[in-house]
């Protein structure tokens, strides 16, 4: 089915207000969920909203909590999220990293005791739109086996790197081949994954999203490389924030909350003039996109460039929502 942005935001707002969330908080949160969905990231927008409400109802998320700065060391700050709403807090933290970068050239905010930030790419994009390089990542509850294991002991720990090119170039990637949200998107659409995304119950690689969702044997991106990167990202976020590691979140909490996150902004214009920056970025993009195609019918992709078209399509033709997901939201 198709809905307008206003209908989608209104549905989110209704549910949030029914939980006695303050009007301004409900409006900003509903706006972020709707913008994420409108941008084509359904897995962490509309599809994720019922799970967000479940955690809100369970008390994992404290909607009126106010993040507090704990430590300030010039370009580096440490904050405690106080388990406030994840996407609103993450937006504020990237804004703060940008403020620090405007003073120091680089700004880093390390956040502890946070909630799921929904679409991590929103915060990298937020920095790049203002002309900054944006880098951020989060740890999570253990939802992926480390390379060589069957049990989930590491997080998918998504990493975002956004570059202020025209259009914005951005990598927004889980340390698994697919996030659990993308497994759900493909299952709901009745599709196999385009490449292997995990292991079946017999330990064989599989493209069946439902099998992987059930047995939780998701495949690390790049096999042992994604596993290793997940581990070091967790270590850095834990140390810089003085917050909880994947192990602590998994063993000490009843669900995924109290995670640790990093937000970095770099003001490129302090290092290079705008015309030179644009020329260098354009040369990189042209060099890549003019390569001989492996398939004449498949364009060479630059990361993040597809979001401009997705956003335009959804604004022109309406936002496609899975019927079953919409029914869940209407029932909340």
Curated annotation (Swiss-Prot):
GO cellular component annotations of the record: cytoplasm
Catalytic reaction annotation: 3-dehydro-L-gulonate + NAD(+) = 2,3-dioxo-L-gulonate + NADH + H(+); 3-dehydro-L-gulonate + NADP(+) = 2,3-dioxo-L-gulonate + NADPH + H(+)
Residues forming the catalytic site: 44
Alphabetical UniProt keywords: Cytoplasm, NAD, Oxidoreductase
EC category name: oxidoreductase
InterPro entries referenced in this protein's UniProt entry, alphabetically: Diketo_gul_Rdtase (IPR023689), Mal/L-sulf/L-lact_DH-like_ah (IPR043144), Mal/L-sulf/L-lact_DH-like_NADP (IPR043143), Mal/L-sulfo/L-lacto_DH-like_sf (IPR036111), Malate/L-lactate_DH-like (IPR003767)
Compartments where located: Cytoplasm
Pfam families per record: Ldh_2
Documented EC number(s): 1.1.1.130
Ligand binding (NAD(+)): 168-174, 224-225, 304-306
GO molecular function per UniProt: 3-dehydro-L-gulonate 2-dehydrogenase activity; NAD+ binding
Location, primary (coarse class): cytoplasm
Family under the similarity heading: Belongs to the LDH2/MDH2 oxidoreductase family. DlgD subfamily.
Cited PANTHER family: 2,3-DIKETO-L-GULONATE REDUCTASE, OXIDOREDUCTASE-RELATED
The protein's assembly and partners: Homodimer.
Functional summary from the UniProt entry: Catalyzes the reduction of 2,3-diketo-L-gulonate in the presence of NADH, to form 3-keto-L-gulonate.
Name of the featured protein: 2,3-diketo-L-gulonate reductase
Organism of derivation: Salmonella typhimurium (strain LT2 / SGSC1412 / ATCC 700720)
